[in-house]
Amino acid sequence: MRSLLKFKTAAIVAAAVGFAGFSTASMAEDTLRIVSWGGAYQKGQSVGIFQPAAKAMGITVKEDTYGGISDVKLMVKSGADKFDIFSSGAGGCASGGAEGILEKLDYSVIDVSNHLPGMYSDYCAGADIFSVVAAWNTETYGDNGPRSWADFFDVEKFPGSRAMRAKVDAQLEAALLADGVPMEEIYTVLDSEEGIDRALDKIRSIKPHIDVWWTSGAMHAQLMKDGEVDMTTGWNGRFDVAKLDGAKVAYDWKTGIMDWEGYGIPKGAKN
């Protein structure tokens, strides 16, 4: 029975990233619990993926939000049972897999034949690509906002309040790019304690100008909607939606640090 339930969980992950062909006849009346990041991103997942997949399979998908891989770790370590599938960036799943808190994914069920190289792993099936960018308030800078990470870190050329993520994801890369490290050498530099310290020191150099350390996409989008900061790091899609909602926000793709989002399964998930 448990293996059947695991198959159903893998099946809806497959629905999110591409079907490889499987029967859904036995899925009626089952419920799967999925958590993601909330806001416009999760709304898009729900409308475009979760609920259509649930309807096609004849199952119920219950959705909630969560705070990232630390929530998965807490759930698994405590023996709690809160969700079956979670949406995560590649780095979060890599960390969770290394800690032994995730199930290995079954790629005989999940079709990744059309994925870009490296966009799936033992613990995370990629679903979409995004970029971390430097966005600015157009009421402050007009069309002349930060066009590079060097600009974002230049508080004399671009005075004003800033926000950055309260986690290292893409922030270390941005800091090193601002510090003059060539793009092709970023991860060579970050593969040493000295390189990490260099990136952290660069972030510390503008810490007095960072008013907010954001913790979610909804939060950094709201910062720009409210005009609370003059510039922030964040995910391009969130800024696109915020602009549609009236936010005075712009960004330059030249600051883009590409990453991918996918789906993982917690170790011992009920379904």
Which positions does each model-derived feature cover?
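C-terminal segment of classical bacterial N-terminal signal peptides
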Residues: 17-27
